[in-house]
UniProtKB/Swiss-Prot annotation:
Gene source species: Chlamydia muridarum (strain MoPn / Nigg)
Note accompanying the cofactor annotation: Binds 1 zinc ion.
One GO CC annotation: cytoplasm
Protein family membership: Belongs to the endoribonuclease YbeY family.
Cofactors that this protein relies on: Zn(2+)
One Gene Ontology term of the molecular function aspect: metalloendopeptidase activity
NCBIfam families the record matches: rRNA maturation RNase YbeY
Protein name: Endoribonuclease YbeY
Length: 161
């Protein structure tokens, strides 16, 4: 578990999988810059990287669906809600899902896809949905523009240096 810089929101990060090496400071940088881009203020965000088995179990517990998925988001406090501490939510991500989705990939493509999963969860925490085709289109546009911004600011996920 990594907790950094108390002047910024606390980003709690737990890497409980062993499929992909993820630099935890890159996760913090991605989340902080994403929140700045979206002009969102919060006290805490939780990001968990899990194995497929652990994510499928959580999927079953939360949604009565034991199938594999790439990410699960549990929004807690909506932006603008007064609470202390303000907890935006929890994101549970399977890096192996990105490996499976991409098939053959470069290291850069893999970390870009895992970054997309984190951004996708953060967007859910902000209230974006992907239930209808229109919602999916809007969410994909938000993902793409956020990922472009993050890439330009060297804030995509990467392996430990």
């Amino acid at each position: 578990m990594l907790i950094l810089d108390r002047s910024s929101p606390q980003i709690f990060i737990s890497n409980e999988q062993q499929d992909v090496d993820i630099d935890l400071q890159s996760v913090q940088r991605l989340v902080i810059l994403f929140l700045e881009l979206q002009k969102v203020s919060t006290d805490q965000v939780y990001i968990y990287f899990l194995s497929d088995a652990a994510l499928a179990q959580l999927h079953d517990e939360q949604f009565s669906d034991p199938s594999l998925t790439d990410t699960i988001t549990l929004p807690i406090d909506r932006p603008g809600i007064q609470s202390f501490p303000h907890v935006l939510g929890e994101a549970f991500v399977s890096p192996r899902a990105a490996m499976r989705f991409l098939g053959q990939y470069t290291e850069a493509q893999l970390y870009h896809e895992i970054s997309r999963y984190v951004v996708h969860s953060l967007l859910h925490m902000l209230g974006y949905d992907d239930q209808t085709d229109e919602d999916k289109r809007i969410m994909r546009e938000q993902e793409d523009s956020s990922l472009t911004f993050l890439a330009q600011n060297q804030a995509l996920l990467h392996p430990t240096v």
